[in-house]
């Protein structure tokens, strides 16, 4: 898992423009994850070979442009707690404002790398004016212009130099199942229901990520780590920024796990915040199991469960091949079924299909249902294979890969899932020139 870098600053200084500038740079960004919020506020980055996750905290600030300083302070405090480094963006046009000084006061008190970026420096006059930001007491500043990218390379070079080293994960480590979801959905209670009276627990160890607890657990003859990141922070610090807090915690948990157990509160439904976490897990290619908790509190009729499940699948389209387990941590209803399902998803995600077997199954399907002609030309797929990657990826070799349209790609994915059982596992399909 890479470091987390938070972009902070008051409204209208160019945080989102700076973020968008970075995620459009192919040499810097290896993947941009949409769906974390309605706008794109989360990206996985790689600058000069160093990976980190970039979060634009500006997207989590509520209210109008003249938002209260107290709310800005809470947002910045959360970023300080969760991030490994912070980029503080100010606006040379406005000069040093009282809100800038308030944020700087917070940042000076932390023992983490803080990089001061003076934005909108696009001419020599503004370059000279940027000197006044020395008064914030944060040391060297970096003049940048988010609109054209000027200065961002120097800033990123300094960021990489400042980021703490993170030990690479040992591939021989036990599988990690992360319990994620919005606050108060029952994440910690779910783990407590599993371990409270269970004699299969081996030990509790400090997690590799800050504030997480890894519980080494053995069930169904399968040993793994349960990762709980919930209920650790003081509620008084997060009650005004629950969505920001939840996503920040989920980023760490999801990037460092194999399977995500996404817990939702049955009385609240599959809301936007749960959807954000679901898409975050999907775009990180993690196995996914959805747990509908507090099912004992829902008034039920004959088809209540079926209708609730259908509602969830509509919300997560087009990736609907995900197991959904209805549980109650209070009564321990189906809590072990949830773990059994997560183990199956992990095994599916780790599955390796032999090339000959894969071709024997898929090529006859393709022959019966070939890709539609495009611009009068026919695509002929002659060979396919699973790629040697940590999560399932498949390559189909053909004469005209550029002419394969998305509907046919979805058709192949559906057939793959039917034939090889990849429930709960995001898969990637590529078409390559033979």
From Swiss-Prot:
Transmembrane segments: none
Pfam family, one: MMR_HSR1
Entries under SUPFAM superfamilies matching the protein: P-loop containing nucleoside triphosphate hydrolases
Residues annotated to bind GTP 2: 181-188, 228-232, 293-296
PROSITE patterns registered for this protein in UniProt: G_ENGA
Record-linked Gene3D superfamilies: 3.30.300.20, P-loop containing nucleotide triphosphate hydrolases
GO molecular function, one term: GTP binding
Annotated InterPro entries: G_ENGA, GTP-bd, GTPase_Der, KH_dom-like, KH_dom-like_a/b, P-loop_NTPase, Small_GTP-bd
Domain of life: Bacteria
Residues in KH-like domain copies: 351-434
Role according to the record: GTPase that plays an essential role in the late steps of ribosome biogenesis.
GO biological process, one term: ribosome biogenesis
Protein name: GTPase Der
Keyword entries, A-Z: GTP-binding, Nucleotide-binding, Repeat, Ribosome biogenesis
Complex formation: Associates with the 50S ribosomal subunit.
């Amino acid at each position: 898992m890479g470091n987390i870098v938070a972009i902070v600053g008051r409204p209208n200084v160019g945080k989102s423009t700076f973020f968008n500038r970075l995620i459009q740079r192919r040499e810097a960004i290896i993947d941009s994850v949409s769906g974390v919020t309605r706008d794109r506020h989360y990206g996985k980055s790689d600058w000069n070979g160093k990976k980190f996750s970039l979060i634009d905290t500006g997207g989590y600030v509520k209210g109008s442009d003249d938002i209260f300083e107290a709310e800005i302070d809470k947002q910045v405090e959360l970023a300080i707690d969760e991030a490994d480094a912070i980029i503080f963006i100010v606006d040379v046009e406005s000069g040093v404002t009282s809100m800038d000084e308030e944020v700087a006061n917070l940042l000076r008190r932390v023992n983490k790398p803080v990089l001061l970026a003076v934005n909108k420096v696009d001419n020599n006059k503004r370059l000279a004016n940027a000197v006044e930001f020395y008064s914030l007491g944060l040391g060297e500043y970096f003049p940048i212009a988010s609109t054209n990218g000027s200065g961002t390379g120097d800033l990123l070079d300094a960021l990489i130099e400042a980021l703490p080293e993170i030990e690479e994960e040992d591939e021989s480590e036990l599988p990690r199942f992360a319990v994620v979801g919005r606050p108060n959905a029952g994440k910690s209670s779910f783990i407590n229901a599993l371990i409270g009276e269970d004699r299969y627990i081996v030990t509790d160890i400090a997690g590799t990520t800050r504030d997480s607890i890894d519980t080494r657990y053995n069930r169904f003859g399968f040993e793994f780590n349960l990762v709980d990141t919930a209920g650790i922070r003081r509620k008084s610090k997060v009650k005004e920024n629950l969505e920001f807090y939840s996503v920040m915690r989920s980023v760490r948990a999801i990037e460092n796990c194999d399977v995500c157990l996404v817990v939702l509160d049955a009385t609240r439904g599959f809301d936007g915040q749960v959807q954000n976490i679901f898409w975050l897990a999907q775009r990180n290619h993690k196995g996914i199991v959805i747990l509908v908790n507090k099912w004992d509190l829902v008034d039920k009729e004959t088809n209540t469960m079926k209708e609730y499940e259908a509602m969830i699948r509509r919300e997560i389209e087009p990736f609907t091949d995900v197991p959904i387990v209805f549980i109650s941590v209070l009564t321990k209803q189906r809590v072990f079924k949830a773990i059994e399902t997560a183990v199956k998803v992990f095994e599916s995600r780790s599955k390796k299909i032999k090339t000959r077997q894969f071709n024997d199954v898929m090529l006859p399907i393709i022959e019966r249902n070939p890709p539609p002609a495009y611009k009068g030309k026919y695509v002929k797929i002659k060979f396919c294979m699973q790629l040697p990657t940590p999560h399932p990826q498949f390559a189909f070799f053909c004469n005209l890969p550029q002419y394969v349209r998305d509907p046919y790609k979805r058709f192949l994915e559906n057939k793959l899932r039917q034939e090889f059982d990849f429930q709960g596992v995001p898969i990637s399909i590529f078409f390559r020139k033979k």
